[in-house]
Amino acid sequence: MRGLLRRLRGVPELKTRRLRLVAMTPEMLEADAAREGRLTTLLKARVPAAWPPAEWELHVLATIFANATAKPESMGWHRYTLMPDRLGRRTLVGCVGGFPRGDGVVEIGYSTLPAFQRKGYGTEAAGALVEYLLEQEGVRAVTAQTFASMAESIKVMERCGMVFAGEGDDPGTVRYRRER
């Protein structure tokens, strides 16, 4: 665990024009799962009552935690999306993350709370993560999947430079991909 925490200190906060993407630490993931309010302190951000997004189930947190401890090279692949206001106060608006699929391919997922959707935050956060991942040693492509009926999610992938790559893993899903 000590090595994991040392590695996290070297993971930079990703910054976009409007957002800050903070690497998820084991402590943050535990606080998030506990739903007791400690996440606000750890992120130094307001956590809306609507947190977490519908897709953000406890087994997802457990998987991210296990992945981070088993594969320290993936530190920084999972991030909370924070939006600072004009005074620098931050609000948690979503999350983005990536899982190695093997052979240099990382699959990303992203979610934005409903109150912050349709403002470009998901695209901005996913785009920053895609760029970050493609700079990492050993990563040759980034993919994402969604249901074919989810036009907004497909737009996010396309705006991140991904192109249609065929059917996804589950029935009714499609996969998009961006090569290095």
Regions found by a protein language model. Give the residues of each.
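GNAT-family acyltransferases
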Residues: 1-107, 111-115, 128-136, 145-149, ...
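Conserved active-site alpha-helix within GNAT-family acetyltransferase domains
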Residues: 119, 123, 149-166
